[in-house]
Amino acid sequence: MSSKTAIKDKWKLKKWFTIVAPKTFGEVVLGTTPAFDANQALNRKVETTLYDLTGDYSLVYVHLYFRVIGVEGDRLLTRFAGHELSRDYIRSLVRRKSSKIDAITDVTTKDGYVLRVKGLALTTYRAHRSQKTEIRKIIWNILSTRASETTFDEFVQDIVFGKLSNDIFQQAKKIYPLRKVEVEKTKLLKAPA
């Protein structure tokens, strides 16, 4: 009969690190994560809702993604990595006899960040192809010009809190009556070195 070897419990060796949101989101605590050392926790992705950061329940459908980029003691510092509206929310917006217009574009901010942004416009009635194309062009133009005029943090704030959606709505409703305009999804593709 062979003797049992002692098994070392690796979970007891791990330390817990606090994950903190960026300064633009008020450095709110996003959660905790276990790791042997802080460098092992780098590049981890954290998901939360805008409701968790602001306390405003009407923003519960906005999901935010952050990536761990640095260490400060036992705190892990993060950077905005993207956002997405919940699928339930988007499905509740789509109606019969109306058009859904998607516009996806890559934009570069003033400070060199590259993001992929997906805009969404919903019309009150069914629109013609030419009207959809014009609305899509307006979405692309506003997204690219606003990105080139603002820094990464300002651009993210405009997207997440709906200021950019409102500006697109005001311009695009001149082409065809719109019911709702949202920035459905963003993803950080490249950050400056």
Swiss-Prot record:
Keywords (A to Z) from UniProt: Ribonucleoprotein, Ribosomal protein
Pfam families referenced in this protein's UniProt entry, alphabetically: Ribosomal_S3Ae
Protein name: Small ribosomal subunit protein eS1
Taxonomic source organism: Sulfurisphaera tokodaii (strain DSM 16993 / JCM 10545 / NBRC 100140 / 7)
MF (Gene Ontology): structural constituent of ribosome
UniProt xrefs under NCBIfam families: PRK04057.1 (NF003142)
One GO term of the biological process aspect: translation
Any single GO CC term annotated in Swiss-Prot or TrEMBL for this entry: ribosome
HAMAP family: Ribosomal_eS1 (MF_00359)
InterPro entries for the chain: Ribosomal_eS1, Ribosomal_eS1_arc
Similarity section: Belongs to the eukaryotic ribosomal protein eS1 family.
